Regions:
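Alpha-helical transmembrane segments
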Residues: 1-5, 77-81, 152-159, 208-214, ...
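Solvent-exposed interhelical
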Residues: 132-158, 190-208
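Hydrophobic cores of alpha-helical transmembrane segments in multi-pass inner/ER membrane proteins
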Residues: 40-48, 127-134, 183-189, 236-241, ...
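Membrane-embedded glycan-lipid processing machinery
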Residues: 31-38, 115-126, 169-179, 222-227
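Alpha-helical transmembrane segments and terminal signal-anchor/GPI-anchor hydrophobic tails
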Residues: 161-266, 270-294
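Transmembrane alpha-helical segments and their boundary/interface "anchor" motifs
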Residues: 23-26, 32-43, 52-117, 131, ...
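Alpha-helical transmembrane segments of multi-pass membrane proteins
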Residues: 2-16, 86-92
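Structural signal for the C-terminal ends of transmembrane alpha-helices
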Residues: 50-58, 91, 137-144, 164-165, ...
Length: 308
């Protein structure tokens, strides 16, 4: 969540038009897109969380129900923020943002369901919907009804195939944004699947699974569309070590706090503090002030919204 806020505040396309940003060092604006590593991390965590949610003998219907339930919890947070966004956009209209009132019923329905969010920064909502309600049931059914290691090898191959379509401009909406992050979801799911069943696998199956994980990491590094390929791999490895790191550095309370409100912070920080009040915020000409005010304000707003 810290990386995401930093990326949205100081990214190449985040700086608001008409605001004096000459005080921001050029190297900072060039380095800020590296922080978009938050998207692979989010989708990895989604896959990891979903990998633990499958029972021993699932039906495809039960898997779809589980995926929908997971998405619905997130959607309730999204819908609350959508209502707040509509109120803010009516009170402080901006020409760069779409008006919900001007949308037809089809686009309005897509906005409400989260399949086509009205705010550009909320595009991950559609990615999350595809991951939980489509990709998860398919992955879970395949790995539970076919030998686990061969099925995961097949998923790895499919993920690379879809990732190769990442730069096809004719793919609309979610079909265009999803393929680059598909291997990260598969990796997260594979890690959870193996962690929950490693004791039941034979030695050869365990070695095969470890090899597949290594190939998956390598594929993310070699085929990723992101310029921060090496950082992607480093941070995915860091996620595995996170429990040990947080204990050693005594960061557990802080990370727990940010994790509890991360979804609300992701949805609220940009449309209020990135669009509507950015002129006053960037006018301070202080990187620390802009980042800290955005972070703290977003956290406090998330805590207040959590009580609704």
């Amino acid at each position: 969540i810290l990386f995401m806020i930093f990326h949205h505040v100081f990214g190449l396309y985040a700086l608001p038009a008409g605001v004096d940003t000459a005080w921001i060092a050029p190297q900072l604006t060039k380095a800020a897109p590296i922080f978009k590593i938050c998207v692979p991390i989010f989708i990895f965590i989604t896959g990891y969380a979903m990998g633990w949610k499958t029972n021993s003998s699932p039906t495809f219907g039960s898997l779809i129900k589980t995926g929908f339930s997971h998405y619905f919890k997130f959607w309730k947070i999204y819908f609350l923020c959508l209502l707040l966004a509509i109120l803010v956009s009516w009170a402080f209209p901006l020409p760069i943002l779409p008006s919900v009132a001007d949308m037809g019923w089809k686009n309005g329905l897509l906005v409400v369901t989260g399949l086509r969010p009205c705010y550009p920064d909320w595009w991950y909502m559609a990615l999350f919907a595809a991951a939980t309600m489509a990709l998860y049931p398919i992955c879970a059914w395949i790995t539970h009804h076919i030998a686990p290691v061969p099925s995961m090898a097949a998923l790895l191959g499919v993920s690379l195939l879809f990732q190769s379509t990442a730069h096809i401009p004719s793919l609309p909406g979610i079909a265009y944004s999803f393929p680059p992050f598909l291997p990260c979801f598969i990796l997260g799911y594979m890690c959870a699947f193996l962690a929950s069943r490693l004791s039941a696998l034979s030695i050869s199956q365990s070695l095969g699974a470890i090899l597949l994980l290594a190939l998956e990491i390598l594929s993310i590094h070699l085929f990723s569309f992101s310029k921060a390929k090496t950082l992607t791999v480093i941070f995915l490895f860091t996620l595995w070590c996170l429990p040990w790191i947080t204990r050693k550095l005594r960061l557990t309370p802080l990370l727990t706090l940010l994790g509890t409100y991360s979804a609300l912070m992701w949805l609220n920080h940009r449309f209020i503090f990135g669009y509507h009040f950015s002129w006053d915020l960037y006018g301070t000409q202080s990187i620390s002030v802009v980042f800290i005010v955005t972070l703290v304000s977003s956290l406090l707003l998330a805590m207040a919204m959590q009580k609704l």
